[in-house]
Protein backbone atom coordinates (compact mmCIF):
# COMPACT_ATOMS: atom_id res chain seq x y z
CA UNK A 1 0.00 0.00 0.00
CA UNK A 2 1.50 3.30 -1.14
CA UNK A 3 0.03 6.61 -0.03
CA UNK A 4 0.78 10.02 -1.47
CA UNK A 5 2.86 12.38 0.69
CA UNK A 6 -0.28 14.39 1.45
CA UNK A 7 -2.16 11.29 2.54
CA UNK A 8 0.81 10.12 4.62
CA UNK A 9 0.83 13.48 6.38
CA UNK A 10 -2.91 13.25 6.96
CA UNK A 11 -2.71 9.78 8.47
CA UNK A 12 0.27 10.84 10.62
CA UNK A 13 -1.78 13.77 11.94
CA UNK A 14 -4.59 11.40 12.84
CA UNK A 15 -2.10 9.06 14.57
CA UNK A 16 -0.92 11.91 16.78
CA UNK A 17 -4.53 12.89 17.47
CA UNK A 18 -5.28 9.33 18.61
CA UNK A 19 -2.22 9.29 20.87
CA UNK A 20 -3.32 12.55 22.47
CA UNK A 21 -6.89 11.38 23.10
CA UNK A 22 -6.25 7.68 23.83
CA UNK A 23 -7.23 7.94 27.50
CA UNK A 24 -9.40 11.05 27.29
CA UNK A 25 -12.78 9.32 27.25
CA UNK A 26 -13.96 9.73 30.82
CA UNK A 27 -17.54 10.33 29.67
CA UNK A 28 -17.83 7.07 27.75
CA UNK A 29 -17.39 3.41 28.75
CA UNK A 30 -14.38 2.41 26.67
CA UNK A 31 -11.55 0.73 28.57
CA UNK A 32 -8.20 1.58 26.99
CA UNK A 33 -5.92 -0.58 29.13
CA UNK A 34 -5.35 -3.22 26.46
CA UNK A 35 -2.40 -4.46 24.45
CA UNK A 36 -3.16 -6.77 21.55
CA UNK A 37 0.19 -6.30 19.81
CA UNK A 38 0.73 -10.09 19.75
CA UNK A 39 -2.20 -10.30 17.32
CA UNK A 40 -1.11 -7.56 14.90
CA UNK A 41 0.33 -10.10 12.43
CA UNK A 42 -3.16 -11.51 11.82
CA UNK A 43 -4.19 -8.30 10.10
CA UNK A 44 -2.39 -9.67 7.05
CA UNK A 45 -5.36 -11.99 6.54
CA UNK A 46 -9.03 -11.65 5.64
CA UNK A 47 -10.51 -13.68 8.50
CA UNK A 48 -14.26 -14.09 8.06
CA UNK A 49 -16.47 -16.01 10.51
CA UNK A 50 -19.53 -16.30 8.29
CA UNK A 51 -21.87 -18.97 9.62
CA UNK A 52 -21.94 -21.07 12.77
CA UNK A 53 -18.68 -21.55 14.68
CA UNK A 54 -19.72 -25.01 15.88
CA UNK A 55 -19.98 -26.35 12.30
CA UNK A 56 -17.60 -26.83 9.39
CA UNK A 57 -17.35 -23.90 6.98
CA UNK A 58 -16.03 -24.04 3.45
CA UNK A 59 -14.43 -20.63 3.99
CA UNK A 60 -11.00 -21.67 5.25
CA UNK A 61 -9.79 -18.47 6.92
CA UNK A 62 -12.06 -18.39 9.96
CA UNK A 63 -11.39 -18.23 13.70
CA UNK A 64 -14.19 -20.61 14.69
CA UNK A 65 -12.03 -22.63 17.10
CA UNK A 66 -11.31 -19.45 19.06
CA UNK A 67 -14.93 -18.33 18.90
CA UNK A 68 -15.98 -21.62 20.48
CA UNK A 69 -13.65 -20.90 23.41
CA UNK A 70 -15.06 -17.38 23.74
CA UNK A 71 -18.64 -18.63 23.80
CA UNK A 72 -17.82 -21.34 26.34
CA UNK A 73 -16.39 -18.66 28.63
CA UNK A 74 -19.42 -16.39 28.37
CA UNK A 75 -21.82 -19.29 28.84
CA UNK A 76 -20.00 -19.98 32.10
CA UNK A 77 -20.07 -16.43 33.48
CA UNK A 78 -23.69 -15.95 32.39
CA UNK A 79 -24.57 -19.23 34.11
CA UNK A 80 -25.96 -21.47 31.37
CA UNK A 81 -24.63 -24.93 30.43
CA UNK A 82 -22.55 -24.56 27.28
CA UNK A 83 -24.41 -27.34 25.47
CA UNK A 84 -27.72 -25.55 26.14
CA UNK A 85 -26.48 -22.20 24.83
CA UNK A 86 -25.53 -20.62 21.54
CA UNK A 87 -24.25 -17.21 20.66
CA UNK A 88 -21.55 -15.44 18.71
CA UNK A 89 -19.21 -12.47 18.58
CA UNK A 90 -21.15 -9.54 17.16
CA UNK A 91 -20.30 -6.15 15.70
CA UNK A 92 -21.47 -4.50 18.93
CA UNK A 93 -24.27 -4.16 21.45
CA UNK A 94 -26.94 -3.14 18.95
CA UNK A 95 -26.51 -6.35 16.96
CA UNK A 96 -26.68 -8.39 20.16
CA UNK A 97 -29.87 -6.62 21.20
CA UNK A 98 -31.36 -7.16 17.76
CA UNK A 99 -30.50 -10.86 17.90
CA UNK A 100 -32.23 -11.23 21.28
CA UNK A 101 -35.32 -9.36 20.07
CA UNK A 102 -35.35 -11.40 16.86
CA UNK A 103 -35.41 -14.65 18.84
CA UNK A 104 -38.20 -13.27 21.02
CA UNK A 105 -40.25 -12.20 18.00
CA UNK A 106 -39.91 -15.64 16.39
CA UNK A 107 -41.09 -17.22 19.64
CA UNK A 108 -43.98 -14.77 20.13
CA UNK A 109 -44.68 -13.22 16.68
CA UNK A 110 -47.58 -10.95 17.66
CA UNK A 111 -46.26 -9.73 21.00
CA UNK A 112 -45.19 -6.30 22.18
CA UNK A 113 -41.65 -5.28 23.13
CA UNK A 114 -41.63 -3.45 26.49
CA UNK A 115 -38.67 -1.26 27.41
CA UNK A 116 -38.04 1.67 29.74
CA UNK A 117 -37.47 5.23 28.60
CA UNK A 118 -33.88 4.93 29.88
CA UNK A 119 -33.15 2.07 27.49
CA UNK A 120 -30.43 2.54 24.85
CA UNK A 121 -31.65 4.41 21.78
CA UNK A 122 -31.01 1.41 19.52
CA UNK A 123 -34.07 -0.47 20.79
CA UNK A 124 -36.43 1.87 18.92
CA UNK A 125 -34.53 1.21 15.72
CA UNK A 126 -34.58 -2.53 16.39
CA UNK A 127 -38.34 -2.54 16.94
CA UNK A 128 -38.80 -0.71 13.63
CA UNK A 129 -36.50 -3.01 11.69
CA UNK A 130 -38.11 -6.14 13.13
CA UNK A 131 -41.59 -4.62 12.70
CA UNK A 132 -42.40 -5.31 16.34
CA UNK A 133 -45.06 -3.55 18.35
CA UNK A 134 -43.38 -1.67 21.17
CA UNK A 135 -44.31 0.14 24.37
CA UNK A 136 -42.20 2.60 26.37
CA UNK A 137 -42.31 2.19 30.17
CA UNK A 138 -41.60 4.96 32.68
CA UNK A 139 -38.38 4.85 34.69
CA UNK A 140 -37.74 5.27 38.40
CA UNK A 141 -35.57 8.15 39.58
CA UNK A 142 -32.42 6.00 39.52
CA UNK A 143 -33.02 4.84 35.93
CA UNK A 144 -34.57 1.43 36.67
CA UNK A 145 -37.74 0.43 34.88
CA UNK A 146 -40.95 1.41 36.71
CA UNK A 147 -42.33 -2.01 37.64
CA UNK A 148 -45.82 -0.67 38.39
CA UNK A 149 -46.02 1.03 35.01
CA UNK A 150 -44.73 -2.11 33.28
CA UNK A 151 -47.47 -4.26 34.78
CA UNK A 152 -50.11 -1.58 34.22
CA UNK A 153 -49.31 -1.35 30.50
CA UNK A 154 -49.11 -5.12 30.05
CA UNK A 155 -52.54 -5.44 31.66
CA UNK A 156 -53.95 -2.52 29.68
CA UNK A 157 -52.72 -4.08 26.43
CA UNK A 158 -54.10 -7.47 27.50
CA UNK A 159 -50.72 -8.88 26.63
CA UNK A 160 -50.44 -12.65 27.02
CA UNK A 161 -46.83 -13.01 25.78
CA UNK A 162 -44.88 -9.85 26.65
CA UNK A 163 -41.30 -9.42 25.48
CA UNK A 164 -39.28 -7.63 28.16
CA UNK A 165 -36.15 -5.68 27.26
CA UNK A 166 -34.30 -5.45 30.58
CA UNK A 167 -31.39 -3.12 31.22
CA UNK A 168 -28.41 -4.52 33.08
CA UNK A 169 -26.87 -1.08 33.38
CA UNK A 170 -28.57 1.85 31.64
CA UNK A 171 -26.56 4.17 29.42
CA UNK A 172 -26.76 7.32 31.55
CA UNK A 173 -27.08 6.06 35.14
CA UNK A 174 -25.91 2.44 35.14
CA UNK A 175 -29.27 1.32 36.55
CA UNK A 176 -30.06 -2.40 36.63
CA UNK A 177 -33.61 -3.60 36.14
CA UNK A 178 -34.61 -6.18 38.75
CA UNK A 179 -35.01 -9.40 36.75
CA UNK A 180 -36.46 -11.28 39.69
CA UNK A 181 -38.93 -8.50 40.50
CA UNK A 182 -40.16 -8.49 36.89
CA UNK A 183 -40.81 -12.23 37.04
CA UNK A 184 -42.56 -11.97 40.41
CA UNK A 185 -44.83 -9.18 39.18
CA UNK A 186 -45.71 -11.07 35.99
CA UNK A 187 -46.55 -14.17 38.03
CA UNK A 188 -48.85 -12.07 40.22
CA UNK A 189 -51.00 -11.20 37.20
CA UNK A 190 -51.13 -14.80 36.04
CA UNK A 191 -48.51 -14.82 33.27
CA UNK A 192 -46.55 -18.06 33.41
CA UNK A 193 -42.78 -18.04 32.89
CA UNK A 194 -43.04 -19.98 29.64
CA UNK A 195 -45.31 -17.27 28.21
CA UNK A 196 -42.87 -14.35 28.02
CA UNK A 197 -39.31 -13.53 27.00
CA UNK A 198 -36.62 -11.51 28.80
CA UNK A 199 -33.66 -10.12 26.90
CA UNK A 200 -30.91 -8.50 28.99
CA UNK A 201 -28.84 -5.63 27.62
CA UNK A 202 -25.66 -5.88 29.70
CA UNK A 203 -23.38 -3.85 27.44
CA UNK A 204 -21.16 -2.53 30.25
CA UNK A 205 -22.29 -4.24 33.45
CA UNK A 206 -22.21 -7.71 31.92
CA UNK A 207 -18.48 -7.74 32.60
CA UNK A 208 -18.87 -6.19 36.07
CA UNK A 209 -21.57 -8.20 37.84
CA UNK A 210 -19.93 -11.64 37.45
CA UNK A 211 -16.93 -10.33 39.38
CA UNK A 212 -18.46 -8.55 42.39
CA UNK A 213 -19.41 -10.00 45.77
CA UNK A 214 -23.09 -9.05 45.73
CA UNK A 215 -24.34 -8.82 42.13
CA UNK A 216 -27.88 -7.99 41.17
CA UNK A 217 -29.75 -10.65 39.18
CA UNK A 218 -28.41 -10.72 35.62
CA UNK A 219 -27.91 -14.28 34.36
CA UNK A 220 -29.72 -17.29 32.90
CA UNK A 221 -29.80 -18.69 36.43
CA UNK A 222 -31.89 -15.65 37.35
CA UNK A 223 -34.36 -16.20 34.51
CA UNK A 224 -33.19 -14.37 31.39
CA UNK A 225 -33.57 -15.83 27.88
CA UNK A 226 -30.73 -13.97 26.15
CA UNK A 227 -28.03 -11.46 27.01
CA UNK A 228 -25.49 -9.30 25.22
CA UNK A 229 -22.34 -7.53 26.36
CA UNK A 230 -19.96 -5.18 24.57
CA UNK A 231 -16.36 -6.18 23.96
CA UNK A 232 -15.01 -2.66 23.59
CA UNK A 233 -16.44 -1.36 26.89
CA UNK A 234 -15.41 -3.10 30.11
CA UNK A 235 -13.18 -5.65 28.37
CA UNK A 236 -11.50 -3.20 26.01
CA UNK A 237 -10.89 -3.53 22.27
CA UNK A 238 -9.53 -1.35 19.44
CA UNK A 239 -12.46 -2.53 17.29
CA UNK A 240 -16.08 -2.27 18.51
CA UNK A 241 -17.58 -5.71 19.06
CA UNK A 242 -19.82 -7.65 21.39
CA UNK A 243 -20.97 -11.06 22.54
CA UNK A 244 -24.52 -12.39 22.58
CA UNK A 245 -25.63 -15.58 24.35
CA UNK A 246 -29.05 -17.22 24.07
CA UNK A 247 -30.78 -20.51 24.74
CA UNK A 248 -29.92 -22.93 21.95
CA UNK A 249 -33.50 -24.17 21.63
CA UNK A 250 -34.62 -20.66 20.69
CA UNK A 251 -31.78 -20.15 18.21
CA UNK A 252 -32.69 -23.32 16.34
CA UNK A 253 -35.96 -21.66 15.28
CA UNK A 254 -34.09 -19.22 13.04
CA UNK A 255 -31.33 -21.51 11.74
CA UNK A 256 -31.10 -22.28 8.00
CA UNK A 257 -28.55 -24.17 5.88
CA UNK A 258 -26.43 -22.23 3.37
CA UNK A 259 -25.02 -24.54 0.70
CA UNK A 260 -22.23 -22.42 -0.78
CA UNK A 261 -20.44 -21.95 2.56
CA UNK A 262 -21.41 -25.41 3.85
CA UNK A 263 -22.61 -24.14 7.21
CA UNK A 264 -25.70 -22.87 8.97
CA UNK A 265 -26.84 -19.26 9.06
CA UNK A 266 -28.22 -18.11 12.41
CA UNK A 267 -26.55 -14.75 12.92
CA UNK A 268 -27.71 -11.22 12.09
CA UNK A 269 -24.60 -10.44 10.04
CA UNK A 270 -23.55 -12.76 7.23
CA UNK A 271 -19.85 -11.99 7.01
CA UNK A 272 -18.49 -11.52 10.52
CA UNK A 273 -15.24 -10.11 11.83
CA UNK A 274 -12.88 -12.97 12.66
CA UNK A 275 -10.29 -10.60 14.10
CA UNK A 276 -12.50 -9.40 16.96
CA UNK A 277 -12.95 -13.05 17.92
CA UNK A 278 -9.18 -13.26 18.37
CA UNK A 279 -9.22 -10.05 20.42
CA UNK A 280 -11.91 -11.39 22.76
CA UNK A 281 -10.15 -14.75 23.02
CA UNK A 282 -6.86 -13.08 23.95
CA UNK A 283 -8.64 -10.86 26.48
CA UNK A 284 -10.24 -13.74 28.37
CA UNK A 285 -7.12 -15.91 28.17
CA UNK A 286 -4.71 -13.27 29.42
CA UNK A 287 -6.43 -12.63 32.77
CA UNK A 288 -7.66 -14.83 35.57
CA UNK A 289 -11.05 -14.25 37.15
CA UNK A 290 -9.22 -13.05 40.28
CA UNK A 291 -7.44 -10.42 38.19
CA UNK A 292 -10.78 -9.39 36.70
CA UNK A 293 -12.25 -9.03 40.17
CA UNK A 294 -9.33 -6.84 41.22
CA UNK A 295 -9.71 -4.72 38.08
CA UNK A 296 -13.42 -4.24 38.72
CA UNK A 297 -12.83 -3.39 42.38
CA UNK A 298 -10.38 -0.69 41.31
CA UNK A 299 -12.97 0.81 38.93
CA UNK A 300 -15.66 0.78 41.62
CA UNK A 301 -13.27 2.36 44.12
CA UNK A 302 -12.51 5.16 41.67
CA UNK A 303 -16.23 5.72 41.08
CA UNK A 304 -16.89 6.06 44.79
CA UNK A 305 -13.93 8.42 45.08
CA UNK A 306 -15.57 10.68 42.49
CA UNK A 307 -18.93 10.58 44.29
CA UNK A 308 -17.26 11.46 47.60
CA UNK A 309 -15.34 14.38 46.09
CA UNK A 310 -18.47 15.87 44.55
CA UNK A 311 -20.56 15.38 47.68
CA UNK A 312 -17.87 16.90 49.90
CA UNK A 313 -18.57 20.28 48.31
CA UNK A 314 -22.34 19.87 48.18
CA UNK A 315 -22.74 18.67 44.59
CA UNK A 316 -25.38 15.89 44.51
CA UNK A 317 -23.43 13.19 42.68
CA UNK A 318 -24.48 9.55 42.98
CA UNK A 319 -24.12 6.11 41.46
CA UNK A 320 -26.16 2.93 41.42
CA UNK A 321 -24.95 -0.20 43.26
CA UNK A 322 -22.13 -2.03 41.42
CA UNK A 323 -21.93 0.79 38.87
CA UNK A 324 -18.86 2.64 37.65
CA UNK A 325 -21.10 5.40 36.23
CA UNK A 326 -21.13 8.55 38.38
CA UNK A 327 -24.06 10.91 37.77
CA UNK A 328 -23.88 14.63 38.57
CA UNK A 329 -25.55 17.90 37.50
CA UNK A 330 -24.70 18.92 33.95
CA UNK A 331 -22.02 21.63 33.83
CA UNK A 332 -21.70 24.37 31.23
CA UNK A 333 -21.25 23.38 27.60
CA UNK A 334 -17.60 24.39 27.47
CA UNK A 335 -16.87 22.04 30.40
CA UNK A 336 -18.64 18.97 29.04
CA UNK A 337 -17.10 19.54 25.64
CA UNK A 338 -13.64 19.99 27.14
CA UNK A 339 -13.87 16.65 28.96
CA UNK A 340 -15.96 14.83 26.32
CA UNK A 341 -18.78 14.10 28.76
CA UNK A 342 -22.02 12.37 27.85
CA UNK A 343 -24.98 14.53 28.86
CA UNK A 344 -28.75 14.09 28.90
CA UNK A 345 -31.07 16.87 29.99
CA UNK A 346 -29.81 18.30 33.27
CA UNK A 347 -27.44 15.43 34.05
CA UNK A 348 -23.97 14.34 33.01
CA UNK A 349 -21.87 11.37 33.95
CA UNK A 350 -18.31 10.14 34.17
CA UNK A 351 -17.31 6.50 33.89
CA UNK A 352 -14.30 5.11 35.73
CA UNK A 353 -13.04 2.50 33.29
CA UNK A 354 -9.91 0.53 34.05
CA UNK A 355 -7.29 2.73 32.39
CA UNK A 356 -7.87 5.35 35.11
CA UNK A 357 -5.11 3.93 37.29
CA UNK A 358 -4.97 7.05 39.46
CA UNK A 359 -7.24 10.01 40.15
CA UNK A 360 -5.50 12.67 38.05
CA UNK A 361 -7.97 12.82 35.16
CA UNK A 362 -10.93 12.40 37.50
CA UNK A 363 -9.64 15.23 39.70
CA UNK A 364 -9.10 17.50 36.70
CA UNK A 365 -12.69 16.98 35.59
CA UNK A 366 -14.15 17.35 39.08
CA UNK A 367 -12.17 20.54 39.74
CA UNK A 368 -13.58 22.08 36.56
CA UNK A 369 -17.13 20.95 37.33
CA UNK A 370 -16.97 22.25 40.91
CA UNK A 371 -15.66 25.64 39.76
CA UNK A 372 -18.31 25.81 37.03
CA UNK A 373 -21.31 24.75 39.12
CA UNK A 374 -20.36 26.79 42.17
CA UNK A 375 -19.71 29.81 39.96
CA UNK A 376 -23.11 29.38 38.32
CA UNK A 377 -24.71 29.17 41.77
CA UNK A 378 -23.02 32.39 42.90
CA UNK A 379 -24.08 34.17 39.71
CA UNK A 380 -27.68 33.05 40.28
CA UNK A 381 -27.65 34.25 43.89
CA UNK A 382 -26.07 37.56 42.87
CA UNK A 383 -28.72 38.12 40.22
UniProtKB/Swiss-Prot annotation:
Q: Sorted alphabetically, which PROSITE patterns does this protein's record hold?
A: DDC_GAD_HDC_YDC
EC number(s) recorded for this UniProt protein = 4.1.1.22
Report the catalytic activity. L-histidine + H(+) = histamine + CO2
Instruction: Report the record's Gene Ontology biological process terms.
Output: carboxylic acid metabolic process
Known cofactor(s): pyridoxal 5'-phosphate
Pfam families per the record?
A: Pyridoxal_deC (PF00282)
Keyword annotations: Decarboxylase, Lyase, Pyridoxal phosphate
Name the InterPro entries on file: Group_II_Decarboxylase (IPR051151), Hist_deCOase_bac (IPR023523), PyrdxlP-dep_de-COase (IPR002129), PyrdxlP-dep_Trfase (IPR015424), PyrdxlP-dep_Trfase_major (IPR015421), Pyridoxal-P_BS (IPR021115)
Residues carrying N6-(pyridoxal phosphate)lysine? 233
Broadest EC class?
Answer: lyase
Tell me which residues bind substrate.
120
GO MF assignments:
histidine decarboxylase activity; pyridoxal phosphate binding
How it assembles, according to the record, is: Homotetramer.
Q: HAMAP family, from UniProt?
A: Pyridoxal_decarbox
- What family does this belong to? Belongs to the group II decarboxylase family.
The name under which this protein is listed is: Histidine decarboxylase
Amino acid sequence: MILSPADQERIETFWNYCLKHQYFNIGYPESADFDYSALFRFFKFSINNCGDWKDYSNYALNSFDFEKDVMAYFAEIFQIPFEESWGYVTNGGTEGNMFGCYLARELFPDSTLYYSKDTHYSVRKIAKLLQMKSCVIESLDNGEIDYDDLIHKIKTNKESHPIIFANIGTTMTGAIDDIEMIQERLAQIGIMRRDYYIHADAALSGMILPFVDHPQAFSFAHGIDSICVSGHKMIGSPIPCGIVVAKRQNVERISVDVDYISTRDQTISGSRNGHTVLLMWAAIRSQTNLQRRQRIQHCLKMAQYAVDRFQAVGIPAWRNPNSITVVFPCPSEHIWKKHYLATSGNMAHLITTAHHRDTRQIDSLIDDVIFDLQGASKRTVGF
